[in-house]
């Protein structure tokens, strides 16, 4: 054992020399691999044999071929700027006094994703046919929307273009759907907001959200893709519907924020930071039923261009043709249906089409049994049932249409809330059910 230990110690103490017989006269193989490495010897060396001069191994420099650089290269971000608000805010953390930063945990100083992975929660992407086969876009509607969006992307001399386009009109007239059709036609993926996001339990949160969504749209535009901010039912979230609605701080700040963005569309800042670099101008499209409920300075002509949408008979026929396009309903029958219900909104005809499937669903329920509906719909290996398209005749459509109209009349005629306050009886609806066996007036 002792002999082994001493032998090992002697071996370990032997230094490695390139000049003696231990190392030999050949050059040791390098640990580097690749064809781009070459061995550089001292000056005056004529043979590969190693001399007393030091050995240097360097890598040969190769010119980078730009043609090999692809968009899918994972290292492309090292030489190109992929900056966005998420990263910019994070860089400012610790560099700005906490007095001017949002409270911890509000999400304004946390980078959630890398910029090339980041997709806004409000981004609406359309995967449908851009040719819009079977769908009808009203010419007046499309003209107004396309001209407004285009004007906001142009630099017109000495002209102040309103940033906001307010589309308002009656309920169920297809304002939002027509906007989405135009966006698809133009190849725009809008940043979406709704009235429910314009109120919060935290003061100032909706106003901050508007700024965030606006800058997200500006970032998309900066990268070469058309975008806009689309707010549905603005009057429902920021308007006053009479004395029964409370005017909150958030209502006030939403109106003020939209006014400020309309006045300074290229200088929209987020809470807790200030970036001197201007953002892209983003056109804002808002819909609503009554803009008189909004703050008057917001809807003045310099800030908001207003468009009242009231579809004509030709528009209604065109939209309804698109609604019944897969049901093989003749064009003349569509015209009869539209003319039979002149006072109804466009979504009435969509509800009418859905009512026709009631008979098919009723047949399936009677054949399956009420007790087994849950198992068949949710726990079946075969999946939920599929139905063939029922045949839609003009007689059946008119019958269901009249039923929908009677339901509407009942709501206006009965008015149970007033009856509850005035008397103990249930009103006309109860009398109709007792006398006629139906809730509909005879």
From Swiss-Prot:
GO terms assigned for molecular function: ATP binding; ATP hydrolysis activity; identical protein binding; ribulose-1,5-bisphosphate carboxylase/oxygenase activator activity
GO cellular component: chloroplast stroma
Disulphide bridges: none
Main localisation: plastid
Record-linked SUPFAM superfamilies: P-loop containing nucleoside triphosphate hydrolases (SSF52540)
Domain of life: Eukaryota
Pfam family for this entry, one: RuBisCO_activase_AAA_helical
Transit peptide: 1-58
Localization per record: Plastid, Chloroplast stroma
Alphabetical list of InterPro entries matching this protein: ATPase_AAA_core, P-loop_NTPase, RCA-like, RuBisCO_activase_AAA_helical
Residues that bind ATP: 169-176
Keywords: ATP-binding, Chloroplast, Nucleotide-binding, Plastid, Transit peptide
Signal peptide: none
PANTHER family: PTHR32429, RIBULOSE BISPHOSPHATE CARBOXYLASE_OXYGENASE ACTIVASE, CHLOROPLASTIC
Protein family per UniProt: Belongs to the RuBisCO activase family.
Function field: Activation of RuBisCO (ribulose-1,5-bisphosphate carboxylase/oxygenase; EC 4.1.1.39) involves the ATP-dependent carboxylation of the epsilon-amino group of lysine leading to a carbamate structure.
Protein name stated in the entry: Ribulose bisphosphate carboxylase/oxygenase activase 1, chloroplastic
The organism of origin for this protein: Nicotiana tabacum
